[in-house]
């Protein structure tokens, strides 16, 4: 079988270049977390956690869990606190078997494998879509998880009836706490501002209006009454879940792009971007850059048509597009070396963005035997994986009932 060929990513800033840091993930990499210089990477379709060490994808997984990966399910979220690793996935009795539950587990990392599996949170298992999945650790060491509506409609989706059921929320997982935010349709992106400590998220709209939100404590994101900028009629319909406050998104795309991972960068190699937020999407393969305002609670634009914080249909997005060609990219993180790393779910690759001035230094080009072996395996399953990726991308932007 001929391997797929993808266009190489391109950046709009000539001072930076994109490197293919690690390739050969066979089964839909979703998210990653750094543990020192090591990277733990989740593969959605097969429930494996893979280790990248010294720039090389290790052949043996550090964990292999049984998952159901239909729809948007599978191995989805990871974050690390010290030597404790938290994972969020759809568990089944055997790979591809009926889903038991969406669960959060903690593990101990001994530098070679994940051990001492402990159940932290059992979440309702209903539909295969809008599971959320992004996890983050804040500046205090608190662990958060975002979960979508999973096809449910109740008080947490701004209906007047229906018991709270851990859907459409940002949950504080460790230590356990009340709902941090509510009214979220679906999300696959959480980030912590390294300066203010505030959480930000991305949110996937239905037919229109994807969002970027400053998700402060007790934030009501508005679903399913509001997506995108609100109007008086919509605001009047909000039932007012006690203690939670709505505000309009910091930015919206009227034409959906399926925003996913987002991150801040606060490092010397990215000195000129310390006041910016970087955001990925899953439909167009774009990497966006948003300049923060002085208070770091909104954005500033030089283009007048973006001053309303909305990219309307037909309006140019040249000002905010930093890079293209990343495919369905689902995670972006700042590494311990101060560089940006991007997981492309559809390319099976981790990309690295690096200043051009640093490219003469020793940079590892990972085309090792282990990676080549992984590529060989990837070709055997590429047809099935391509179908699942298409479903994953489609359901990020619009509810499609499972067949």
At which residue positions do the language-model features occur?
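Secretory targeting signatures
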Residues: 1-8, 359-403
